Amino acid sequence: VTPHVWNKDMYYSSLPFTLTEPELCKKCILWFAKYGIKYKGTKFEGGVFHSLSNSLSVIMLSGAYYEYFGEKEFFQQHPKLYKKMKAILQTVLESREENEPYLYRTTWISDAYALGKYHTGTNLCMYRSFMALARIAEEVFGEKSYAEMLRSEAGKTRKDIERYMTAKGLFGTQYLEGISGIAEEKKECDSAEKYQKEMLDQGLQFITDVNHD
């Protein structure tokens, strides 16, 4: 119907392959290595932080694949894949300011703006990506010190998710969708102004692109 690919939906549909279809899963991993990061377009700059969780898809899929099948040869035969995953995490690590928590920003989730300055689900993806690449780094490539660094960063991110991205609810502690800051008064409220835009200004350009034939 349209020339567009919904990366988030494709990622979700690829997850069962990490348990059932190793050959197909490997093709998906290589696909996300090539297309997972939004390219520069006419409406958006693209890049790793356009949708951080989409950019991390290749790492999370790789981690799930290795966790279940334990195949080292695939990664050893694709050194550029490992290099690409390391580069993605390095870009993210370098984005954090010294006075910031160990949480990371994103503009979009997939087809909607991420809620808050720091989006909870995206940072859970960061934690998972740190842990996934740490295991591959150590067990496949023997990079123990690098793996230890990633696990350390994962621990810091997990700690700050629990510290800043939770609130007391009717049934106890619950996770927030996102937070506009780390101060208590900014955790549970955010301005709706930046989310109140016309449909065509929100990146949903496919609406005018449908092939009615």
Which residues does each PLM region occupy?
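Short loop/turn segments at secondary-structure transitions that flank enzyme active sites
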Residues: 65, 110, 167
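Aromatic-rich carbohydrate-recognition surfaces in CAZymes
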Residues: 3-99, 120-127
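Residue-level detector of alpha-helix boundaries and kinks
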Residues: 43, 77, 111-112, 146
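Residue-level detector of functional hotspots within protein domains
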Residues: 44, 58-60, 104, 110-112, ...
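Short, flexible helix-coil linker/hinge segments at the edges of structured domains or between repeats
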Residues: 94-114
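Catalytic cores of carbohydrate-active enzymes
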Residues: 1-2, 103-104, 115-119, 125-213
